[in-house]
């Protein structure tokens, strides 16, 4: 069975756990409608992605 050779310092333990924290999701503003949406995702209200119509808007 594998056993650690040295004790893990609090600094190293904290550096390892730093990736476990919850991060606030990023949002970008749609230049056409001004609505917020996730980057690299389709804007669900307008159905646009990178200037192209991908989905039909919900209002139609």
UniProtKB/Swiss-Prot annotation:
An MF annotation (GO) of this entry: structural constituent of ribosome
SUPFAM superfamilies associated with the record: Zn-binding ribosomal proteins
Biased composition (Basic residues): 1-16
InterPro entries in the record: Ribosomal_bL32, Ribosomal_bL32_bact, Ribosomal_zn-bd
Pfam families for this protein: Ribosomal_L32p
Any GO BP annotation: translation
Compositionally biased residues, Basic and acidic residues: 34-44
Keyword Ribonucleoprotein part of the UniProt annotation: yes
Region (Disordered): 1-60
Superkingdom in the source lineage: Bacteria
Gene3D superfamilies in UniProt: Single helix bin (1.20.5.640)
A cellular-component GO term for this protein: large ribosomal subunit
Entry's transmembrane regions: none
Keyword line: Ribonucleoprotein, Ribosomal protein
Family per record: Belongs to the bacterial ribosomal protein bL32 family.
Xref: HAMAP family: Ribosomal_bL32
Protein name: Large ribosomal subunit protein bL32
